[in-house]
Amino acid sequence: MRFDVVTLFPEMFSALTQWGITGRACQQSLASVHLWNPRDFCPDPRKTVDDRAYGGGPGMVMMAKPLEDTVAGIQASHQAAGIKSGPICLLAPQGERFSQKIATDILDYGNLSFICGRYEAVDQRFIDRNVDIQLSIGDFVLSGGEIPAMTIMDAVIRLVPGALGDGESATQDSFMNGLLDYPHYTRPEIYENLLVPDVLLGGHHAKIADWRRQKSLELTLRLRPDLIESARANGLLTREDEQFLRSL
């Protein structure tokens, strides 16, 4: 999985490329992150990437030309490597809310280019001419698109085959089956008078699977009932699931 990231702060991405699961995936060439600074595509001595907004108002606007030249550089690198360019994604508050399903869709692209905005906004003409999709990670404002981009890349890289130590880990994450994850326990069996549920100690795999499924349903109904409705609409609930939900 290849990511190309247009950012004024490429140093920020070392947190993703050097540490943890994502860092290991990059070191093993399961994922690659290519960083592109639009200042490198500015011909003027000051490397200007922003200017005042037409019509007035606070803040500066990222200029279309440096961003478009950067995208051209990305596409040229794809062509040189024999890679078909994937979608161009702008991280923006007005974007579609990122979800686990979108993470799976991105994995299918094979490569994705992120535009990490800064300042007040990005010139709309660049968006109209170049951006294929816009994504948001929530209804709040951040200083730039770098943290949302890293959030999305983390979620996608986890899905790359071989990125996780256990091949089943990603499939058992929250949201992968439309529900929240079940509770997890590790040693010791008793901690501050709190016990690990007996069913997890018995070694009966079918009973453990049933317990985990029921706990997942119970937690989802209590904390995110909207996900239950979505799972039901998408045919992800079995007859046994529905019977259990009615018993709660």
Curated annotation (Swiss-Prot):
This protein's UniProt keywords: Cytoplasm, Methyltransferase, S-adenosyl-L-methionine, Transferase, tRNA processing
Q: Which reaction does it catalyse?
A: guanosine(37) in tRNA + S-adenosyl-L-methionine = N(1)-methylguanosine(37) in tRNA + S-adenosyl-L-homocysteine + H(+)
UniProt superkingdom: Bacteria
What CDD domains does this protein's entry cite?
TrmD-like
Where found in the cell? Cytoplasm
Similarity annotation: Belongs to the RNA methyltransferase TrmD family.
Role according to the record: Specifically methylates guanosine-37 in various tRNAs.
Protein name per Swiss-Prot or TrEMBL: tRNA (guanine-N(1)-)-methyltransferase
* Gene name tied to this protein: trmD
